[in-house]
Amino acid sequence: MNLIPIFVFSKIAKDIFIKNKIDKRLLNKVAYLRSECVPVILYSRLPYSILKAKIEKLGGSIKFELPIINAWSVNLPCNKLAKIASLSGIHFIAEDSTIQVQLNIATQEINSRKVNDLGYTGKGVTIAFLDTGIYPHPDFTKPKNRIVAFYDVVNGKKQPYDDNGHGTHVAGDAAGNGYASNGKYKGVAPEANIVAVKVLDAYGKGLSSDILAGMQWVLDNKDKYNIRIVSLSIGETPSLPTFLDPLVRGVDTLWKHGIVVTVAAGNSGPNYNTITSPGTSRNAITVGAVDDKRTSDISDDEIAQFSGRGSPYLYKPDIVAPGVKIISTASGNVPFGADEIMVNKAYRTATGTSMATPMAAGAAALLLEKNPNLANIQIKNILKSTAIKIGDAGLWTQGSGMINIEEALKKV
């Protein structure tokens, strides 16, 4: 009888243990990238000086710390991943993946115009948009400038700008006041304050670490600017369990600090189990998209085909809002999608769960204006309990249904 030595079993077990500490997407890159450096997010509680020495010894470098998830943004040679993972104090190595944007009648459908007329406009509440930046559009800056802060993770610029257009559009969905259209194209919370954090480049893409750096800035400055809400119209196909997913961990940290977080369900429908990360967060208010057919009559509405769906294992989205051909603020002449159409120099249309998400953020601002003491979980529950069902679409397609701000305010 041939006996396999104990040390062989020990080595196999060790190899399995090490591989389980590395994102599978990174393991797939090892074969063809070899010694090339790749951006990773490294979970470790080692002191900076010790971690820096270990990483540099193996040819890597630390970019910056991500205390929001107890991790580091690091560049590592592909062929040294296993060596790094084997070190004591290294918990997990995740790919620093590329995230992208998730690319009126709408405000009438969710009844925000009615509550605006009653005096609820989001005044005094700040919404932070982590996106491509913001153009200083008249709908944000007149009659007074409501862009209270701008932070640029990508290029380090100080003054507000948007070299893509997506961030400007979503900010208008939530907080545009319609100044350039005499109130015609107005967002849900037209007097809310705006914080714009640029985490995506001119192509609408960015690394997870940059988005996490933006989240960290929001967390560090939430009291200074009264940031009560974060709107995230971004996403990627989930590749890790939620407890290891860097973006989900970031969202959950914001939520634990009392911030309302609205996140796009993603545009990968209509199949089930297509919710994008970080919309997979159990805490976040995940928002799907409705096609309102450009009418204020809800009876002809349908859940958009592209809107991400949940599954029996993930009860998402939480709610839905209009997300097809939404007219909102334009960033000069900067185009950001093939589906967009210029209405005039100041406005353009866009389609996606990206557009639905800030509407939910605006709704949260109206509730917080009426009662600033509401907790984020209370806001989530109010929006869900007052939502209107869209046709016979199921739970994993529409969640609780279309947000109804008029009814939601009655519960506050």
Regions found by a protein language model. Give the residues of each.
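Autoinhibitory N-terminal propeptides
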Residues: 1-69, 79-114, 118
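Solvent-exposed loop/turn segments at secondary-structure junctions
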Residues: 99-101, 133-135, 153-154, 180, ...
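Subtilisin-like serine protease catalytic core
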Residues: 116-129, 134-149, 157-209, 225-228, ...
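Extracellular S/T/G-rich loop segment that most often corresponds to the catalytic His/Ser-adjacent loop
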Residues: 131, 279-369, 407
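Hydrolase catalytic cores
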Residues: 171-174, 195, 199-201, 274, ...
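Short beta-alpha junctions and helix-cap segments that line functional grooves
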Residues: 182-184, 247-251, 271-275, 305-306
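Short acidic, glycine-rich surface-loop motifs adjacent to enzyme active sites
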Residues: 215-241, 264
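Catalytic-core regions built around general acid/base machinery
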Residues: 246-261
